[in-house]
């Protein structure tokens, strides 16, 4: 269920402060964050945000189509390697 419109988007305060500092300084260095729950806002367009996936920080370049989505949606946490192959079928 989506968040109520009267509440507005959620973004962690420490991440918002980092975004504002990067915009003022004009830095292109990735912003490291562990806040996967924060929503992408229009101020983040053009920035690279390194989102933690539990093991490493995944760089996410923010575009205008991403506004309204959460940062965690763009940093997958699970790696799928496929099911094990059937050994009987390989021998034939």
Swiss-Prot record:
Q: Where is the signal peptide?
A: none
The protein's name is Small ribosomal subunit protein uS19
Alphabetized GO MF terms: rRNA binding; structural constituent of ribosome
Stored PROSITE patterns? RIBOSOMAL_S19
Matching InterPro entries: Ribosomal_uS19, Ribosomal_uS19_bac-type, Ribosomal_uS19_CS, Ribosomal_uS19_SF
Family designation: Belongs to the universal ribosomal protein uS19 family.
An example Pfam family from this entry, by short name, is Ribosomal_S19
Give the originating organism.
Idiomarina loihiensis (strain ATCC BAA-735 / DSM 15497 / L2-TR)
Q: Which UniProt keywords apply?
A: Ribonucleoprotein, Ribosomal protein, RNA-binding, rRNA-binding
Q: Name one GO cellular component term.
A: small ribosomal subunit
Q: What is the stated purpose of this protein? A: Protein S19 forms a complex with S13 that binds strongly to the 16S ribosomal RNA.
């Amino acid at each position: 269920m989506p968040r109520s419109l009267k509440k507005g988007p959620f973004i962690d305060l420490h991440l918002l402060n980092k975004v504002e500092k990067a915009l003022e300084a004009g830095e292109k260095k990735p912003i490291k964050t562990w806040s996967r729950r924060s929503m992408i806002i229009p101020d983040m367009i053009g920035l690279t945000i390194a989102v933690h996936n539990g093991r490493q920080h995944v760089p996410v370049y923010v575009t205008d189509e991403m506004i309204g989505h959460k940062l965690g949606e763009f940093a997958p946490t699970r790696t799928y390697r496929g099911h094990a192959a059937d050994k009987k079928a390989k021998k034939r």
